Amino acid sequence: MDYKELYSNYNKRLPFTQLRKWYDKDKDGTKVRELAELQIDIFKSGVSIMVGRDLKNGRTVKENWSNVYGQIDTMYSIFALCKQFIQNTTQTETMKIPIVKVARDDNGKALGDSTLVNAHVIIGRNEKEFYFGVIQPQKGGVHFLLHPPMPGKQWLVAKKDETVDSLTLSKIFATNYFDRILRELDVVKDELTAIYNKAYPRKVKEESKEPEKVDNGDDLDTGLEDII
């Protein structure tokens, strides 16, 4: 097995990270129902956030999809910041986290320490829910509500037959969402470490197996023979 190739092209789907959003779109003066999706996956040892819009009948249209890619350690920290925001925020607010890339010249050479903002990860809270999304320059963004699906009366409190507070429910769902992502990334890092060590083992110089000859004086001419 070529572990170097396996390490460079390591991929893993994370299906539980998918978020969906139905929205109304104006088309020729008529409102039509459209679908947006967000999906987080591991791609070539990094983290990919795919966002698709107008997917109801356009899932296979390339222009409907955008992708944000970041190194696994960077994205791990971003998701940890999102979780911390959810746990600590006490008011309606938004946090914008930039994902940067190295700035390069026309020949592909890095321009010192200069960086460019590739996209922003958005985590926020309104009066009822937490939301999460990605904004890319010149492409806009989509906010996905962090809220479990609620068919029928699934989330009614039996005691008073009243609905559960939507903000509390959203906070629990959002915390669990980022917890699962962080746990999965921990597994990915362990797997990548194992593959990396097989692909690039540390080379240790082997010592000679032939024992050193120890001079114990047996071959010395001591002159004792003449005395004896």
Model-derived features: where do they sit?
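A cross-kingdom feature marking solvent-exposed beta-strand/loop segments within repeated
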Residues: V51-Q71, M150-L167
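Intrinsic, low-complexity N-terminal interaction/targeting segments
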Residues: E93-V134, G140
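N-terminal "first-domain core" detector
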Residues: M1-W65
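Short, surface-exposed beta-strand/loop "edge" segments at domain boundaries and coil↔beta transitions
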Residues: K31, S48, L55-V61, N107-K109, ...
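Short, mixed charged/polar active-site loops
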Residues: T60-N67, L116-H120, G141-H143
